């Protein structure tokens, strides 16, 4: 899922840093992105030059500290509340003040995820549908304390990357 989200941003000309816990996972993720772009080229939907330019916008790291100055982080780990809370606690420590911390959860309580941080006003759900680089629907999930400017930014960014953003509240299963 993370690779498709990365591609959605790169396809819109936005640079992305892919974080994985280890080099093996990072190499596999970047290779899958490369394979997806190669498939798109082979189908004649992109030139090799376009695919290469987009792929060049995606860098990788295994170090959370590389996210210190980013404006937005989208977490795309598996659907475990414990894991998501651990990730958000770490993001809270390393990301700059005002950075938007988004979860790609498809059904977990964004309020509970936000509670793992000291800045619940900056936490939002951004649920991409699979494959994220193809599917256009994007659920923007407002938690109880999500700030209005975070919602506005998420909605505008969804449009910028070619998605159809739909605002939802926290509920089991959201919209999709």
What are these regions (language model features)?
Residues 140-170:
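Internal alpha-helical scaffold of NAD(P)-dependent oxidoreductase catalytic cores
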């Amino acid at each position: 899922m993370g690779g498709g989200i990365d591609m959605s941003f790169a396809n819109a000309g936005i640079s992305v840093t892919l974080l994985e816990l280890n080099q093996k996972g990072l190499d596999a993720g970047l290779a899958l992105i490369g394979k997806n772009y190669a498939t798109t080229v082979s189908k004649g939907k992109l030139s090799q030059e376009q695919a290469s330019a987009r792929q060049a916008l995606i860098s990788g790291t295994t170090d959370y500290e590389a996210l210190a100055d980013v404006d937005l982080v989208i977490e795309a780990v598996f659907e475990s509340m414990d894991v998501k809370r651990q990730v958000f606690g770490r993001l809270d420590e390393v990301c700059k003040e005002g950075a938007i911390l988004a979860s790609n959860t498809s059904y977990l309580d964004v309020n509970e995820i936000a509670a793992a941080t000291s800045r619940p006003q900056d936490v939002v759900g951004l649920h991409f549908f699979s494959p994220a680089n193809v599917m256009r629907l994007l659920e923007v999930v407002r938690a109880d304390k999500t700030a209005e400017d975070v919602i506005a930014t998420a909605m505008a960014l969804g449009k910028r990357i070619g998605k159809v953003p739909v605002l939802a509240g926290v509920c089991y299963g959201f919209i999709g």
